[in-house]
A protein has these predicted regions:
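ACP-dependent fatty acid/polyketide chain-elongation machinery
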Residues: 1-67, 247-257, 354-368, 416-420
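Flexible, low-complexity linker/loop segments at domain and module junctions
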Residues: 1-8, 95-98, 293-299, 330, ...
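Condensing-enzyme catalytic core mediating Claisen C-C bond formation in acyl metabolism
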Residues: 5-9, 36, 216-293, 302, ...
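Conserved beta-ketoacyl condensing-enzyme motif
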Residues: 8, 23, 29-164, 193-204, ...
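Acyl-CoA/ACP chain-elongation machinery
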Residues: 39, 184-230, 263-277, 307-314, ...
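Active-site-proximal alpha-helical scaffold in enzymes
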Residues: 78-91, 145, 150-153, 158-194, ...
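Phosphate/pyrophosphate-binding loops at sites that engage ATP/ADP/AMP, CoA/4′-phosphopantetheine
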Residues: 85-97, 249-256, 286-302, 324-328
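Glycine-/small-residue-rich "gating" segment that lines the acyl/pantetheine channel
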Residues: 124-133, 174, 178, 194-251, ...
């Protein structure tokens, strides 16, 4: 069976550095940090008092307020990015076979705010007997965003959620890619969203010592590959990619951002939350993706790394890149856009895939910000080009995006410049 080619025809993003793809791209190219004091709740007693929050989000631009009240914030973000991406793709839904359009859209955590709020209300009022919101369960569960998107458009194709912590939305893109190239769908709305900047989310990650505590200068806290890094910054938002079978896209005259070349998946099988110190899973997932794409490592121009600004993770990923790419590792560009967006958890892969695609489209690699002279880690080879502090112009024909999740889940997707 000949596999079908898959292209990207629409993009949508809600992020801490911009609502909508154009604003997101402009800000990451210019090295703008989305970090600041937490406003979603009073974090004054928490070890970490800052995050990368979405700003000025108005859900009524996407759905009416009555419907929004039935959704957790993470689902509202999902609806917003899906609507932007579908509109961007130019799909005329009324002319499409809706049985051939699917939605694969995930969340690493899901409706934690809804859960926290409802359980809190129960303990506050428990002497009155149990009383829960009738939308408690559908607001909370991590599959509901995919369901809501399909209901909104009437898409009857493959529909489910992925959940693999921070690898979630890359896995969603990978599944969408595989289903389309196997002929199971013409179009799939893929991606992920997250909204976990609430007491349980921040407190839980603080308890694991995963978050930066640089409260005096939040905008400088995410500093991947720098010696003084002390953990990641929580982010929120969503990203959506419209994946489409090539001939279907051409038949309707769609613009094509890039082609999906290959995907990889692997497991560290090492620790609940820490990366394998030698980058075993990271190495394997990149090799798997390159093999799937039938691509020589020397063809890769840019790697959007997982790069969370954690002590172990950054070292292991840099080691893995050197092992997989050999001498070519010193020729390509590497950057962590998490230095600006923070870590969007289950939405990270989709948002970083968008950054990778736009690097191909525009010939610009966004930077890894916040590296300072002398702040070098003896365990990291700085002959690698981490694109520190300033975007770099270069031709990008192939971009690879890594995402690694708690539990040892690793996912990788490779995009390439579209050519007939």
């Amino acid at each position: 069976m000949e596999l079908k080619r898959v292209v990207v025809t629409g993009l949508g993003a809600i992020t801490p550095v911009g609502n909508g793809v154009p604003e997101f791209w402009e800000n990451i190219v210019n090295g703008v940090s989305g970090a600041g004091p937490i406003t979603h709740f009073d974090a004054s007693l928490f070890k970490t008092q800052f995050a990368c929050e979405v700003k000025n989000f108005d859900v009524t631009k996407y759905i009416d307020r009555k419907e929004a009240r039935k959704m957790d914030l993470y689902t509202q973000y999902a609806i917003a990015v899906a609507k932007e991406a579908v509109a961007d793709s130019g799909l005329d839904v009324e002319k499409e076979d809706l049985n051939r359009i699917g939605v694969i859209f995930g969340a690493g955590i899901g409706g934690i705010h809804t859960f926290e709020e409802e359980v809190g209300n129960y303990y506050t009022r428990q002497e009155m007997g149990p009383k829960f919101n009738s939308f408690f369960i559908p607001k909370m569960i991590s599959d509901i965003a995919a369901g809501q998107i399909s209901i909104m458009y009437g898409f009857h194709g493959p529909n489910y959620a992925t959940c693999s912590a921070c690898a979630t939305s890359t896995n969603a893109i990978a599944d969408a890619f595989n289903l389309i190239r196997l002929g199971k769908a013409n179009v799939i709305v893929s991606g992920g969203s997250e909204a976990a900047i609430f007491p349980a989310g921040v407190g839980g990650f603080n308890a694991m010592h995963a978050l930066s505590t640089r409260n005096d200068e939040p905008e400088k806290a995410s500093r991947p590959f720098s010696a003084s890094r002390d953990g990641f910054i929580m982010g929120e938002g969503g990203g959506c990619l419209i994946l489409e079978e090539l001939e279907h896209a051409k038949a309707r005259g769609a613009k094509i951002y890039a082609e999906v070349a290959g995907v990889g998946m692997s497991a560290d099988a090492h620790h609940l939350t820490a990366s394998h110190p030698e980058g075993l899973g990271a190495k394997l997932v990149m090799m798997n993706a390159l093999e799937d794409a039938e691509m020589d490592p020397k063809e890769v121009d840019y790697i959007n790394v997982h790069g969370t600004s954690t002590p172990v993770g950054d070292i292991s990923e840099a080691k893995a890149i050197k092992e997989v790419f050999g001498d070519h590792a010193f020729e390509l560009n590497i950057s962590s856009t998490k230095s600006m967006t923070g870590h969007l958890l289950g939405a990270a892969g989709a948002v970083e895939s968008i950054a990778s695609i736009l690097a191909i489209k525009n010939g610009i690699v966004p930077p890894t910000i916040n590296h300072e002279e002398g702040d070098d880690d003896e365990n990291i080879d700085y002959n690698l080009n981490f694109t520190f502090n300033k975007a770099q112009k270069r031709e990008v024909n192939v971009a690879l995006s890594n995402t690694f999740g708690f539990g040892g889940h690793n996912a990788c997707v490779i995009f390439k410049k579209y050519a007939e």
